[in-house]
């Protein structure tokens, strides 16, 4: 699958690389990064030139070497630069980490769907319990989202949500102001999971529940909690690491961008 030049450029710019104007006259993208002095990444602006695929491969190999990230993982991330991508990594050491029981794998996919639907319903109509996760926009988001290839590193399920898949606005207030609906959903999912996990880890779950009951626009719903339960298998005794890759097409605040994956165990 050929990576379009604009996708590669936008990915690099989102990760601190800046465009040098002198290459444009030769129809080349030339980028540099203050974190990697004396290194440049160069590739053609036109994907039809004969050496375009090789140039992209070289850029990815250089980037892999500089960042210590696997080339294939980088390639996957570049291909989803226009998506917000949810990653669920299952950690089940006693199972060998290379396969899952079929029933649990199915529950995991359903759980990922339910997480996104619960977050979408909260963005549209924040409440403690959604009687049915069947709001039209929530279902449309699931239709537009894509199930990615599992990745190396135990079992990693990826779901990519195109940032501009739906042209609607929710009612949940955001300090950032106007954001694409998909970004509102993925931010809500990240922030609600952060709240929930922090409360569990600090023994403050009862206090969180009371606060949610008083909140006119609660981030966490009972539906989200039910979805979380589907990510755990009693027989496997697994943990799940939840992380998000943010599309480069919309700004993301540093507190939301940074940090380790959220661990459910």
Stretch-by-stretch model annotation:
Residues 72-264:
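Long, hydrophobic alpha/beta structural blocks
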Residues 2, 49, 53, 102-106:
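Generic detection of long, well-ordered alpha-helical segments
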């Amino acid at each position: 699958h050929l990576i379009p030049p604009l996708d590669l450029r936008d990915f690099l710019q989102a990760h601190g690389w800046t465009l040098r104007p002198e290459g444009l006259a030769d129809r080349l993208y030339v980028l540099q990064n203050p974190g990697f002095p004396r290194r440049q990444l160069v590739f053609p602006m036109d994907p039809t030139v004969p050496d375009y695929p090789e140039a992209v491969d070289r850029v990815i190999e250089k980037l892999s070497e500089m960042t210590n990230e696997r080339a294939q993982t980088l390639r996957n991330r570049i291909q989803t630069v226009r998506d917000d991508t949810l990653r669920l990594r299952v950690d089940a050491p006693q199972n060998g980490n290379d396969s899952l029981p079929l029933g649990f794998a199915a529950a995991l996919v359903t759980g990922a769907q339910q997480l996104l639907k619960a977050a979408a319903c909260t963005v549209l109509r924040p409440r403690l319990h959604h009687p049915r996760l069947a709001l039209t926009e929530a279902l449309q988001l699931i239709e537009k989202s894509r199930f990615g290839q599992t990745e190396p590193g135990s079992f990693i399920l990826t779901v990519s949500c195109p940032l501009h898949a739906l042209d609607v606005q929710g009612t949940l207030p955001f300090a950032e102001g106007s954001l694409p609906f998909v970004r509102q959903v993925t931010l809500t999912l990240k922030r609600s999971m952060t709240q929930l996990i922090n409360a569990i880890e600090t023994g403050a779950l009862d206090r969180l529940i009371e606060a949610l009951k008083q909140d006119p626009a609660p981030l966490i719903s009972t539906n989200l909690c039910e979805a979380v339960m589907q990510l755990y298998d009693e027989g496997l005794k697994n943990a799940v690491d939840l992380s998000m890759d943010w599309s480069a097409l919309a700004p993301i605040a540093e507190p939301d961008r940074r940090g380790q994956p959220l661990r459910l165990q």
